[in-house]
Amino acid sequence: LRAELGVIPPGDLRMALAALCDDSQWGRTWSDVMQHRFSIKTHPDEGLDNHALGNLLIVTLWELLGDPVEGLRWAGALLGARGQVLPMSCLPLVIEGDVSPGSNPTQECPPEKITRTVTGQSRLAKEADVCNVRLSPADAPACPEAVTAIEEAAWVVLGPGSWHTSVLPHLLLSELRDAICRSPAKRLVTLNLSRDSETLSMGSVSYTHLRAHE
């Protein structure tokens, strides 16, 4: 959807909306609807196969309303979501990272140790030994509503989620990073209960390098 329609990635936003549905029949049903993925029996891996319905709904609202923030607000109202979901930026971004087998996740990779560069969220999420993650364009503006929400928050919680492709990107946008650093809110890093491809080489101590951003 992102490549074909030029929109910001809806996947993490869909997951957040589904998680904010309340524990009622309405909320549980809509959470399941948002997370439902089509399974095409005749021609798998084509068309809508494995596409989440929630992504289609979100992108439809974006096209109709012309505003990612407003589209997410309408989606939240439809679902009865408790809370507001905001994008980190309203500009489509590309994420890429360098792969360096055996690298220390708390240190920058020396250029001579980098074996390849992986571009795209879905591809990068399958890699281990990732370092030097970056966004393009690097100077993209943050969503103003997201900056305001951080400034007014009592708690800023990072995670759980895919470490390199869902959590760290928020610290790569300068406006969001600065808002987190100057916020009087308490900060909490929530680790995943199980490791995925991105964090196979990381122990819990590896996450403490986030303090370098303070």
Predicted feature residues:
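A short helix->loop->beta-strand "cap" motif at the edges of active sites that frequently abuts
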Residues: S183-R187
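Active-site beta-alpha connecting loops in nucleotide-dependent enzymes
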Residues: S194-Y207
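Electropositive, gly/pro-rich neighborhoods at or near active sites that engage anionic ligands
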Residues: R2-A128
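Structural beta-sheet core signal
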Residues: V189-L191
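Conserved small/polar residues in nucleotide/adenosyl-binding loops
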Residues: T208-E214
